Structure formats: C-alpha cells, structure tokens
C-alpha cells in the first residue's frame, strides 16, 4: 500500500515511516523544508513538498496515495497564537478528508488522550467522549467522513517516549532543569499513561492493515504512573539528585504546555487495540528508560 505520511520526519512520523517500509509498504513522505526532504531522500523515501499552512499541498499528497497517516503538527514558538494554530490544523484535516470522499481510501488521524480531559483514576476506553476543543473538531470531521466513503481511523496517543527524545519528555526535562528539580503540578498525584515509540508505530501500521472504518484506538502500554514519581525519575536522569519541585495548580501556566499535560490525570485502557488489532506493546517502560535507558544521565 502507498501511504502518504505527514510529519514524516517528526518524532512519531519517522518511526511510523520506518515501521511501514519494514513491513513492505511504500511511503510518500511530506516535507516542509529542504532539510526534511533531504532526510527522507537519504532513507529512500519519496518526497512530497507540503505544509499545514498550505492545505492544497496536503490534498495533492493525499491524492497520490492509497492511505493517509496524519501526524504533522505546527511548529510552535513562544508567541504562538493557539486559535490560529487550531484553525490551521482543522483546515488542513478538513481539506484532506474532503478530497478522499467516495474513494474508500484510508485516513488515520493522530488525536490524543488529552481529548478526554481529566480522566480521574479510572482508565477510560474509546467510548469516553472527546471534549477538548483542541481535539474534538478534527475527530468529528474525520469520523463523520466514514459515511462519505472514507475509511476513517483515529489514534489517541498518550505520552510517547524512547530513544532519548520526545517533545513532551524533553520539555519536562528542560523545565525541570530550569526549576532545579523534577517538576510536577500540585501534589503530583495526577496519573498518566505512556507508550514506547516503536510500539505506537506498530499500532499505526496494524490499524492501517486491520481496522474497520470509524474506529478509534487508545495508545498506551497499560501502565499507570503518578506524575510525582516520574518527576523524581526525571530529576535523577537530569543529574538533579532526585530533587523535585511542585508548581501550584493556580500557577500552572509557569510550566507551559507540559503543565497542561501533567496537571491532570490522563489514563486510558488499551484493551480494544489489543483485542481488535492483536497489538501487543512490548517496549521498555518509561521508568526503565529514565533510570537505565536512553534518558539516563
């Protein structure tokens, strides 16, 4: 199958490309820059130049493939306008999905467990409503297209980690270094799910190959961690001696986007993906990666 992957040189996108090609699929990778295009060409990946700010460029990529896996996310600076960011994302998704109507082609959207809001202490399954305005419009658009001849699928990742990278984990490290200790919000009792990079790449491929239209899948490894415990492990890995720092809930803006991620509980069930797709996440745990793996100091 020929798959158009947006964000093909990003953290998750690059792992998906590697998994797809390893399984015999052909990838058309979207590149925003000459640098990204060169990275794809070095790996033998066909390049399609495009970007979120130019929806028509993404439509052209979608038309050239049998399936689309959308992982691209806008680049964010310190003065980012989130309303404009959201508009750009929803416009690009809508354009691609509309171009696929009546084709029975596959469109896989990267959403996120953050769409559930605060899950509390119980792991939620995919029947839980998506309420966050950052996630709901795109999910509604993509899922609604199932009735119009699009094989729509949604993946809802939690915190992705591995290989000493990850936007979320590295932001957590950077904030902790700035604050002089592993950062958590409030009492640090918010709960979180997470998933190793190779495992989420495998999930995307299995969804591409096996899923029925109109299905969503949570992406995690089944473990549940307190954010304070993770913050302490990050402190050790960052050479901060295990010291931790609490940011009060009413000052969560000091933590930037990472504060919104770790300030409330986001725990999910993965039984559906395991049952329907025969998916079995098997990578090292986040705590192992922090203590002795790719993030260890």
Segment roles from a protein language model:
Residues 2, 203-258:
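Mid/C-terminal beta-alpha module of Rossmann-like enzyme folds, strongest
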Residues 3-23:
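N-terminal Rossmann NAD(P)H-binding glycine-rich loop of SDR-like oxidoreductase domains
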Residues 28, 88-133:
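Conserved Rossmann-fold NAD(P)-dependent oxidoreductase catalytic core, especially the SDR/UDP-sugar
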Residues 29-94, 98:
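NAD(P)H-binding glycine-rich loop region in Rossmannoid oxidoreductase-like domains
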Residues 140-163:
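Conserved beta-loop-beta element that borders a ligand/cofactor-binding pocket
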Residues 173-182, 190-224:
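Alpha-helical substrate-binding/gating segment
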Residues 252-280:
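Conserved C-terminal active-site "lid" loop/helix of NAD(P)H-dependent oxidoreductases
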Residues 284-297:
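Amphipathic terminal alpha-helices
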